[in-house]
Amino acid sequence: MSSDLAAPDLAAAADVIDLAGGVVGKGVRHLAANGGPDVHQLLAYDLAHAAAQVETARALLDYGAKGAQEAAIACAFTADMVHDLITRIAGREASWGIEIAPLKAAHPFLQQFRSPEFVASLAQQAGPRHLDGEMEMVIDGVAGRYG
C-alpha cells in the first residue's frame, strides 16, 4: 500500500459498524412496531440485506486483526457497507423510523477507505486466506478444475 493512503483503522471501522448496526436496529424495531414484513416488504428486504452486511463487516474485524493487508480489506468492506446502507435509507428515513442522515459521522471513514486510490490499492495483491493446509488443497483443486 502506498504511504500516502490512509492506514487501516480497525477501531474506526468498529465504530462505524456499531453506528450502522444501531441504524439497522432502529429500522427493525420500527418494522416490528408497524405491521411487520407483510405490511412493509421493501423495508424488510432492505433491513435483511443491511443486517447481513453489518454482521459481515463485524466478522471481518477478526480477519482484519491478522495483518495490515487484512485490515485494509476490512476497512474497505466496512466503507462499502455503510455507503450501501446510506443509499438504502436516503429519502426513506420515515419508513425506517430514523432521523435524516443518521450515518453522517461515518463520512470521514468513507472518505478514507472508499477513495478510488485506497480501493485500487487492494487489487495489487490477494488477501491472505488463513486456511489450513487441507482447505488450501481444496481451493487449489477447485481452481485447477474451474479456474
Feature annotation, model-predicted:
Residues 1-147:
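Flavin-dependent oxidoreductase catalytic core characteristic
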